[in-house]
């Protein structure tokens, strides 16, 4: 029995979807539970060459044997959820989905408020998905809960009970974090942050799991960190530099071009300390050095690639156990014992 949390180590878009999908296939958890803010965070999952952009359904959906859960702490947009369940019909998502009956519900008024608020949309760079305004209503105790919405009633359940029962039965459980640690309302570059905390402890609370039940925390870092929206970015490079390195990316939810920077070891160390990270996953090593593309054995990585991994381990103080060298699940180096 292992309970693992996957957390973003930067400003989101670290490639958590790829790492989560890999862990769900390799470790075969019986339940995959999503924590985080809500549908403001997008993940791209590639299965057999086909890409799926999702915002509500857990990223581990390709594992057709696992239950898929959205915790009570996660805001739910019924319209987005139902669209994704339909899009993922061939994965039998609808039969495996559990939405906690206590989750907060995003309505049209929240999305309209988010988009029309000049401070949020222009100064902060909000995604416009209604999460911030919905969390305001939640704090005021006026927000609807899942149990109040008929359209999703067939998917409702008690996620905390499901997860804890799975752990007590000796099953593996994977908790998906969203966005990134540096976007945390508490620990990020306020006010250029999201509307709640985005660290491992909060993700555990989102799905109703106590801290002593957590065995592993995997912090995911991209070789070239990126950021969407406003706010500080200490190692940011120019657009020209990013293009010369072939690093041009766009956000899954907003479609906005991502800002790109160099790896920041000091910030990575702070993030690992904040989350109690037990291991690190590095993604897009093939972007850092194209000679690493598709390599699946550590010893066959280029010297440049190995040096990058070694420097991360030495400066951050946490072992790198997973290395992504391409978009496919098979393009992963796994050095876990």
UniProtKB/Swiss-Prot annotation:
It catalyses: IMP + L-aspartate + GTP = N(6)-(1,2-dicarboxyethyl)-AMP + GDP + phosphate + 2 H(+). GO terms for cellular component: cytoplasm. InterPro entries: Adenylosuccin_syn_GTP-bd, Adenylosuccinate_synth_dom1, Adenylosuccinate_synth_dom3, Adenylosuccinate_synthetase, P-loop_NTPase. CDD domains: AdSS (cd03108). Its cofactor is Mg(2+). Its EC number is 6.3.4.4. This is Adenylosuccinate synthetase. GTP binds at residues 12-18, 42-44, 258, 284-286, 324-326. IMP binds at residues 13-16, 40-43, 127, 141, 179, 194, 256. The gene is purA. Pfam families: Adenylsucc_synt (PF00709). Homodimer. GO terms for biological process: 'de novo' AMP biosynthetic process; IMP metabolic process. One of its GO terms (molecular function) is adenylosuccinate synthase activity. It comes from Methanococcus maripaludis (strain C5 / ATCC BAA-1333). It is an enzyme of class 6 (ligase). Mg(2+) binds at residues 13, 42. It is found in: Cytoplasm.
């Amino acid at each position: 029995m292992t309970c693992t949390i996957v957390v973003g180590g930067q400003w989101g878009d670290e490639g958590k979807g790829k790492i989560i999908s890999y862990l769900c296939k390799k470790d075969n958890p019986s339940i995959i539970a999503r924590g985080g803010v809500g549908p403001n965070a997008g993940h791209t999952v590639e299965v057999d060459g086909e890409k799926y952009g999702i915002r509500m359904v857990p990223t581990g959906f390709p594992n057709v044997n696992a239950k898929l859960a959205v915790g009570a702490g996660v805001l739910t947009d019924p319209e987005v959820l139902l669209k994704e369940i339909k899009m993922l019909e061939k994965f039998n998502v609808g039969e495996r989905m559990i939405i906690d009956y206590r989750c907060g519900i995003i309505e049209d008024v929240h999305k309209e408020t988010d988009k029309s608020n000049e401070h949020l949309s222009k100064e902060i760079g909000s995604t416009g998905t209604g999460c911030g305004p919905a969390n305001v209503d939640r704090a005021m105790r006026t927000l609807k809960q899942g149990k109040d919405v008929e359209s999703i009633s067939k998917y409702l359940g008690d996620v905390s009970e499901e997860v804890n029962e799975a752990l007590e039965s000796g099953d593996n459980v994977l908790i998906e974090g969203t966005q990134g640690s540096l976007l945390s309302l508490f620990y990020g570059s306020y006010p250029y942050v999201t509307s709640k905390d985005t660290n491992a402890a909060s993700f555990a609370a989102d799905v109703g799991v106590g801290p002593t039940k957590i065995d592993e925390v995997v912090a995911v870092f991209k070789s070239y960190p990126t950021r969407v929206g406003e706010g500080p970015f200490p190692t940011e490079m120019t657009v020209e530099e990013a293009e010369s390195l072939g690093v041009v990316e766009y956000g899954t939810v907003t479609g906005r071009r991502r800002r790109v920077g160099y790896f920041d070891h000091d910030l990575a160390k702070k993030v690992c300390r904040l989350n109690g990270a037990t291991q690190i996953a590095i993604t897009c090593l093939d972007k850092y050095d194209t000679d690493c593309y598709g390599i699946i054995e550590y010893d066959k990585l280029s010297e440049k690639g190995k040096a990058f991994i070694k420097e991360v381990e030495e400066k951050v103080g946490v072992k790198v156990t997973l290395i992504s060298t391409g978009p496919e699940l098979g393009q992963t180096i796994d050095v876990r014992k």
